[in-house]
Amino acid sequence: MQIQFHLYNTLSRTKEVFNPQDQANVKMYVCGPTVYDNPHIGNGRSGVVYDLLYRIVIKIFGEKTVKYVRNITNVDDKIIDRAELLGVTIDELTDKVTKEFHKNMAYLGCMLPSIEPKATKHTDVMIAIIERLIAKEHAYVVDNHVYFDVLSAPNYTELSNRSLEEMFEGVHVENSKTKKNPQDFVLWKPAKQNESANMNFESPWGLGRPGWHIECSAMSYKYLGENFDIHGGGADLIFPHHTNEIAQSRCAFPSSTYAKYWVHNGFLTVNGEKMSKSLGNFITIRDLMDKQIQGEVVRLFLLSSHYRRPLDYNDKAIEDAKKTLDYWYRAIENINVQKIDLPHDFMQSLLDDMNTPLAVKIINDYAKGVFISKTEEERQLNASAIITCANFIGLMNKTPHEWFNSGVDELYINEFVNKRLEAKKQKNWLLADQIRNQLLEEKIILEDQPDGTTIWRKE
């Protein structure tokens, strides 16, 4: 019996059975970062959500049949402004932020995509698509700008499910006097005076650079063709970015439907408020790394809520994720765990539109099972289910010893343990107790063994 994966499609606003156009060639595109500043925790949520989706699709169809493209936007007005502010070159900024993004994704346990194209390497494809749009009268040139004619696009509002007036209400519109319609968006913009040369490119319309939306249309076309299966991104990209991608791609290639399934993850807030630098609650993934919060803790936090629902970052949520992982790691401690087939109920939770809260509950139930098991065989089966399920969603990639002692200076602690053992030999109980209490203040628990040795663990 074929596995049925139900996935919510923003385009149809329903959960649909995922049926790729070619099961031997499943194609997935996700909007990657604009590399002007260090990625924030919201970017991390997107990275983890689509990493999980990638893992599920691989499980169903096989690793060699799935192509996952995630782009790098390295040409943008924000990049120019940020480089100027920092007094660095465009390349210095984008290279540094791209490397930071890769470190952040590794920290969160995300697999590498199949292909990670950079926008600046694909301006030829962008120009070719823009020329097609002009030829088909879906785009026009004004003062060296090329604009897309929104009113020429059939079903422009389909993805957002709002009227044109609602979509543009309160939206700042640039160069509205030179456009046919105020809603028309830029496909190509001319270079500004004194701008960095490596941010502009030769084109039939003069030196300039692409608009944001055409970049993703071009890179998805280059690597996945006119039609592909999944397009993912944050809910904030539904309009204008994804709406404009659909419009320009379908108009450039009239026989194309572009992406079949549109998947969007929900917003992330911080302590109940929208994340904003002006509010002082802007949290980067680097901030979490510098606090020595383990990546698995952040990943579990990001998976703790259904991907389409809002998620609030706060200290308690991180603390709860840490306690949960401690519980799971404690459950498999000193048990000979083995990889087994993914339990049916766990897999079914993920096949139901990636229901990660239910998946996490199921792992918790297996952990409880370990502690109430009456036989060693039952304990081993529950522990093996924990590690198999957790590994599948990118968690529990350490041994319990590595987990509980992460960030601890083992040489420092072992030195005190040995001093305490020596004190006990000399019956200096006062010193032995002082050492135990000192380590306890540092959240290190000592456990004396029947054979006279002492083991330690983090609280």
UniProtKB/Swiss-Prot annotation:
Cofactor list: Zn(2+)
Binding residues annotated for ATP, in chain numbering: K277
CDD domains linked: CysRS_core
Keyword set includes DNA repair: no
Residue numbers binding Zn(2+): C31, C216, H241, E245
Location in the cell: Cytoplasm
GO molecular function: ATP binding; cysteine-tRNA ligase activity; zinc ion binding
Chief subcellular location: cytoplasm
Motif 'KMSKS' region in this chain: 274-278
GO BP terms: cysteinyl-tRNA aminoacylation
Record flagged with keyword Protein biosynthesis: yes
One GO location term (cellular component): cytosol
Motif ('HIGH' region): 33-43
Cofactor note: Binds 1 zinc ion per subunit.
E.C. no: 6.1.1.16
PANTHER family tied to this protein: CYSTEINE--TRNA LIGASE, CYTOPLASMIC, CYSTEINYL-TRNA SYNTHETASE
Quaternary structure note: Monomer.
HAMAP family, sorted: Cys_tRNA_synth
Name this polypeptide is given: Cysteine--tRNA ligase
Recorded name of the encoding gene: cysS
